[in-house]
């Protein structure tokens, strides 16, 4: 019996990513391909019908998809001090986009492509803060940013994941704004967080968190390599 039955949109998206990667690895001739395809598409439809609304994607749900609080993905101490919980997060949208891009690579489907394109547009037009050269992290339901924060790990991760999705889902003629955004994010992270002993974690209300987190360092490797290759 699961101890935690919460349905996180983030988790559904990672399941899509894993199934789609499996599909690409085994190929259409494998007898398991159709099963993986059907499960991935069922999860895609579930996200689009149960985890989405007119403004974007929700975060966490009961097993029957009644919305619940999202403490696990919005557990920043500053938000907790204010008794605030993010209704939307940049991180969830990023991994929904990642899953959809991988699914489209495995099995081109126009509904998947269009849903991914909407995610890309939301990053460019809503979550990206061009004045501060960063992605905002935590939001209320109407996309009001809840915290003056830059997550260096998420920004360098987004710099390559968003571009990967743009190359996969968009015609070349529509990619230029995403290239500019992704290169700007990577450059801002390099300027603000890169040191000779790894990448800083984040900065919140002007205070830098110097903690070295494993996944932040890993995303830094691929993010800067991707920026170099652009």
State each model region's role.
Residues 1-230:
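Glycan-recognition and catalytic cores of secretory/periplasmic carbohydrate-active enzymes
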């Amino acid at each position: 019996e699961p101890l935690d039955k919460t349905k996180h949109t983030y988790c559904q998206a990672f399941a899509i990513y894993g199934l789609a990667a499996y599909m690409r690895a085994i190929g259409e001739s494998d007898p398991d391909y159709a099963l993986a395809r059907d499960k991935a598409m069922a999860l895609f439809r579930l996200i689009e019908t149960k985890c989405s609304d007119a403004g974007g994607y929700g975060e966490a749900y009961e097993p029957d998809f009644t919305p619940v609080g999202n403490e696990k993905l919005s557990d920043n101490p500053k938000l907790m001090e204010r008794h605030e919980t993010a209704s939307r997060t940049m991180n969830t949208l990023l991994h929904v986009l990642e899953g959809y891009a991988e699914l489209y690579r495995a099995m081109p489907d126009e509904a998947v492509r269009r849903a991914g394109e909407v995610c890309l547009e939301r990053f460019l037009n809503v979550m990206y803060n061009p004045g501060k050269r960063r992605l905002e992290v935590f939001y209320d339901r109407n996309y009001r940013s809840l915290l003056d924060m830059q997550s260096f790990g998420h920004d360098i991760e987004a710099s390559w994941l968003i571009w990967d999705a743009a190359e996969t889902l968009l015609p070349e003629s529509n990619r230029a704004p995403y290239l500019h955004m992704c290169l700007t994010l990577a450059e801002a992270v390099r300027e603000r967080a890169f040191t000779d002993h790894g990448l800083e974690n984040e900065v919140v209300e002007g205070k830098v968190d110097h903690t070295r987190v494993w996944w932040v360092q890993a995303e830094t490797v691929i993010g800067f390599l991707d920026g170099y290759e652009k």
